[in-house]
Amino acid sequence: MKTPAEWKTLFESSAFARQTNYSGPLGPEYTPSGTRLRLWAPTAQKVSVNLYRRGDGGACMGTLPLEQHGQGVWSVYLPGDQHGHYYTFTVEVDGTAYETGDPYARTAGVNGLRSMILDAPRIDPPDWSHDHRVIVPASRRTVWEVSVRDFSQDPACGVRNAWRGKFMAFTQKGTTLSSAGTFPTCLDYLKRLGVGYVQLMPIFDFGSVDESRPLTRQYNWGYDPTNYNVPEGSYSTDPTKGEVRVRECKEMIASLHAAGIGVIMDVVYNHMYRSENPLNSTVPYYFFRQNPDGSFSNGSGCGNEFASERPMARKYLIDSVLYWAQEYHIDGFRFDLMGLYDVDTMNELRAALDALPCGRNILMYGEPWQGGGSQLHRYEANKANLTMLSERIGIFCDNTRDVIKGGCFDAREPGYVEGRPGSFWDIGGAVAAWCRSDKLPAHSPSQIVSYVSAHDNFTLWDKLMLVRYARPEYTAADSAALAQNRLAAGIYLTCMGMPFLQAGEEFARTKKGQGNTYRSSPSLNRLDWKRAAQFHGLVDYYRGLLGLRAQFPRLSASDAASPAAIKFFSLEHPLVGWTLPAAPGDGAAWRALCVFYNPTEEEKRVRLPDGQWKLLSDGVSSALWKGPSRVCGGEVTLLPYSATIFGQV
């Protein structure tokens, strides 16, 4: 019997790779006349399939042996129409038998324990064959991050009861606050806000919510993968039927596409929920990195980390992403802890996506860091190696986040908008997507994801309140914090790169000062649609800035000349001011932008460059650009805590 350390030595040998690397299909291959199951299990002595009628409970209908083929692949053919039938594998390795689901399962029963054979076209939504990924112009590429659960859990959201917290909530049109017919919520709200993409926190099958129990008190963000190619059952209206979660997930995607909104999937291939999972039960120790003593490396901070550099692990990751892109028409992928993947895997995946029809439009970006020390001994897909990554693989820029609002690990640490001394120097770096700074390696401005809040750490509103007050009143409509919120938005939404915001940032979302709510109560995590109506002025401010940004494409340009064209003014500290001319022929609404940031509590006077300048946003109203606002020249006044934007006419 091999020790974990001996398995590690074997798996990292060139001989093992040569004998077991396989490039063909794996998982179920369905036809009406029969289904072939293929499983890669090169270390197994014996493999059998267990057949079930149901996804939970019920006796096994029978067990059949799989036949061993070359390169570690086992297979069995099941005659007849197998759609809707469930199965597991029993894999015997080194004298130990493991019963497990199929790592390549397309759907599953309750809690993902039994895989289900699926004839996808049979259960697809009407007109699914006509659905397609949305082509979002670069100037509209703003990402709004939300959990399926949070989106519609609020009883006041107007969504029918059976769909609250589910995929189907994204399909209901005409919802309003408390169904009163006034303030739009959910899908209608999103369409009005004007974001280009919705980034969905994990929608694959995760293990931290029990699908067999009511969800009244259960909650988790879902960064606990169980089945990578299966939609999460708790987000469906019936987790006992494997086809329902697939159909309803596709209905959600089709609805967002019909609204002109792309769908980005938050993927967590860097670790799995438990070591007892389909990958580790099929080929123990292969898919996860190990320490020299054979124990699991824990660069994820969650107990294990995926070995993307091993050939069949790399194949699995790429196969899975391509499956979601093709079968579910996903518009982009956000990689959790991307620093745990090797550069070669990420670049190979980017090339594979590019090879799909219109695949170059699929977004790909991630967190360029790890959750702890790792046994990855290849180049990591992190900030330090940004130059090695494809120019179309983006990164979350914590430099931008921290300089604007302050560090995320110290609740009281201020940033530029809260008056941190000296921080104005780095605001210029953020504006130019750090292309003119030595704080990041050489990169394209479009690789930078500019943001100030995401699901991790404090919401922007809570951070602002924690810096301002010893005992914050989080639900209060604090005028100074509102002004700082507008300033923060005014900065990152005028930075080069791709903007990103946490759902609800635009209406002062609060989690009452809690910075890590991954398993807190549903009521704390859900979007508060009454608060959205209460802070409708802030919502309109974000909406106006999103529209303004779309009118000036050069802010979203990918060429090196664009950040180089930004001219910064010499102003009294801590004011920041700059201009950027429009690129020739890019269809911009103005010949140039001129932007000033004032992080003080006082009005400030500055001088505009020569020429005529239309006031587009004064830091309170961001929709002035839509109407006949005044044309300025000479000296102008900046409001306290404001981002003031002018367009040259």
Regions found by a protein language model. Name each.
Residues 29-45, 565-608:
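Carbohydrate-binding surface patches
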Residues 39, 89, 146, 200, ...:
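Conserved, mostly hydrophobic/aromatic
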Residues 52, 477, 481, 527, ...:
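C-terminal accessory region downstream of the catalytic core in glycan-modifying enzymes
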Residues 41, 84-87, 628-649:
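C-terminal beta-strand-rich structural cap/linker in extracellular carbohydrate-active enzymes
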Residues 19-24, 485, 494-514, 524-593:
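Glycan-recognition and catalytic regions of carbohydrate-active enzymes
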Residues 149-328, 337-357, 363, 374-375:
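Substrate-binding/active-site clefts of carbohydrate-active enzymes
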